[in-house]
Amino acid sequence: MAEGAELFFTAPFTSAAKGDKVADAGTAAAAAKAGVAAIVESTAAEAAEKAAHIVGLLPANNLTGPAIFEFEQPTAVLAAGAEPAKAAAAVVDKDSAVELYAGFGKSVYTAFATVGGNAVGVVATGKNLCHNCVAKASRFVRLCDAFSVPVITIVDTEGFVPSATDDIAGGIREAARLAATYADATTAKVAVLAGKAVGPVYTALAAADLRIAVTGCTVSALEPSAAVSVLYKEEIDASDNIIAATNAKAAAYTAEVCSAANAVACGAADLTCDAANVRASVVAALELLSTKRAARLPKKHGNMAL
């Protein structure tokens, strides 16, 4: 969408005349903030050029193999706690990413890119995921699945926003939709457990064909501090300093139970690697899944939460 373009159901001047005046209503900036415009460019010509570039990354249909592009290796190395865009940049080909919906659901990064010259979709998570962030990820994965574009999900998050307000705004519905979207998608899916992948957010985002646990990540059904408060309650209560005892137990629990190696041992991940070898592992995983074709049962569709 061009910066000077307008998009609305109700003309801003009509709405304002009725007392419903909203700043920037109908503008490209408002469309981007609402998650309607995927990209905003300065001019119509630049917007058309960007649209052509994105279409060029996509195959003609879900059965056509992707185009192969020239590429350069990235120079960055994946680090736990990195901003989503930087985490993605460490995995995809250098300068190949085209971010979509940057102004909407900002704790999730979604982009088309290439890995080893092959088109992929990338979802990378930030600290906390609100209902808009989750909706953004769901929609992007559905788009990738429609064209059988492989999806790489980089998971490093505190989880869904712990907020009753966000729940009422649609947090629970969107989380259910996210889990259903990943489960329903038949395209190749690779999950990189780069940092924290705890509780329901792991269940939703790590529904992949191959899950790569990066050394130093935390994979757990429950936040370690909460887990030890239950498992070692009597021992912690008997200590002189409950906070210090809880922290010590949580650190030990994280190292012994929530490690990358233990995630592989218990089936929560398929392989482990260090940060320097994440891209190589992703390239190998995509090569392994390049011939994936999933057969569907002859039925209409599932009952996804919409």
Predicted regions and their residues:
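Ligand-binding clefts of soluble mixed alpha/beta catalytic domains
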Residues: 1-306
